[in-house]
Amino acid sequence: MLKSPYSGGHLEVIVGPMFSGKSEELIRRVTRALIARQRVQVFKPAVDDRYHESAVASHAGRTVGALAVGDVADIRAHLSGEAPLLQASAEMPDVIGIDEVQFFGPELVPLALELADAGVRVILAGLDLDFRAEPFGCMPDLLARAESVEKLTAICTQCGAPATRSQRLISGEPARFDDPVVLVGALESYEARCRLHHVVTR
């Protein structure tokens, strides 16, 4: 679909564990919007610099240009034209994509709603659960308010079943429940696991 099936602005949320293809799906949707000659702007948290500083990148290596921002205030400033250092937008995009939304604060929720109310297609991708399998950041609120939700699964590294959890590993061992929630990493720190094989040390 070049156009979303929803008329006017709306929220699309893509969730799942690490290695489930969330960024890949965001890139796919954004690329289709670009082919359809829609105005598109993609944002990513500056803290996520694993693969590329100025692009959303999938684990498979696909990329789409993105603006790295420190927080939601930076997104607002860019969209309002008050952020010369962030290449302020001349006009409101038709489509806004935001990757790794779990790293943004709760103020992302009202911004996403405002954008949708203004007629923007907002595509949000991120983890729904943290490494402890607890709801992650602002994602539960976004899921409740979205018109469209796609929950992806990965493959459990232990048994090959569909994986819905992100297993954090520290020196090869499961992380402790009271470890910091945010730890940016990839294969060196995380594995996809099913419910049965997801382990959190207490």
Swiss-Prot record:
Gene3D superfamilies: 3.30.60.20, P-loop containing nucleotide triphosphate hydrolases. One of its GO terms (cellular component) is cytosol. It catalyses: thymidine + ATP = dTMP + ADP + H(+). Keywords: ATP-binding, Cytoplasm, DNA synthesis, Kinase, Metal-binding, Nucleotide-binding, Transferase, Zinc. ATP binds at G16, P17, M18, F19, S20, G21, K22, S23, D99, E100, V101, Q102. Its EC number is 2.7.1.21. It is found in: Cytoplasm. It holds the Pfam family TK. Its main location: cytoplasm. GO terms for molecular function: ATP binding; thymidine kinase activity; zinc ion binding. The active site is at E100. GO terms for biological process: DNA biosynthetic process; thymidine metabolic process. The keyword Isomerase does not apply. It is an enzyme of class 2 (transferase). Zn(2+) binds at C156, C159, C194, H197. NCBIfam families: PRK04296.1-1 (NF003296). Homotetramer. HAMAP family: Thymidine_kinase. Belongs to the thymidine kinase family. This is Thymidine kinase. The gene is tdk.
